[in-house]
């Protein structure tokens, strides 16, 4: 009796099954992050439990602990999703996100500032409630305090890169150093300033955006580059 030939499609099917499992795992992770983001926004950090997140995501609690470094790690993922505009977008490196790429590729200093500022009202609106929850939790949780410091350091470093990109294109006003530009960007674009103007004083996101673009241009750019949009 002849031996049947080996089936040639076994390996591709195994690869397909592996890719399918990876995509299912990624989809589950995204569902958990989105559920966590919603729950943290609604309940605050202290009021959020892993059980609530698991129920919202349709998974068991053990699945969350296998995927994230506890509640603090899940909060970090929720913040990243809020900044990016969703868990799926957060999976892409920052520099590959279209809005960020547009800022990086823009050569005109005034338009570079405007492109950057265009992204900020939405980010602040999504992140500001989480920032308040993080500040409250950081006061009593060392792990959250470290996360708060890390996120602020990352924001400061991001403003340093932005200031360097302005300087590289000759876009800084005479007498303004890269370090000063970094600190101005870091301060003026803080969640605190957004909360004071938009939340406390009732400015519209559009008014805040235009004010921020105009202020940064007037302080940082050479004369002749301050014209409003």
Question: What does each of the following model-derived ranges do?
Answer:
Residues 1-27, 224-229:
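N-terminal intrinsically disordered/low-complexity leader segments
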Residues 67, 77-78, 162, 211:
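Residues in the recognition helix of alpha-helical DNA-binding motifs
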Residues 115-135, 142-169, 179-183, 210, ...:
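Amphipathic alpha-helical packing segments from all-alpha helical-bundle domains
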Residues 31, 35, 39-73, 77:
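Helix-turn-helix
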Residues 167-215, 223-229:
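Hydrophobic/aromatic-rich alpha-helical bundle segments in the mid-to-C-terminal region
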Residues 45, 68, 136-141, 191:
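Short helix-capping/turn signature of helix-turn-helix
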Residues 73, 77-80, 84-125, 182:
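Hydrophobic alpha-helical connector segments
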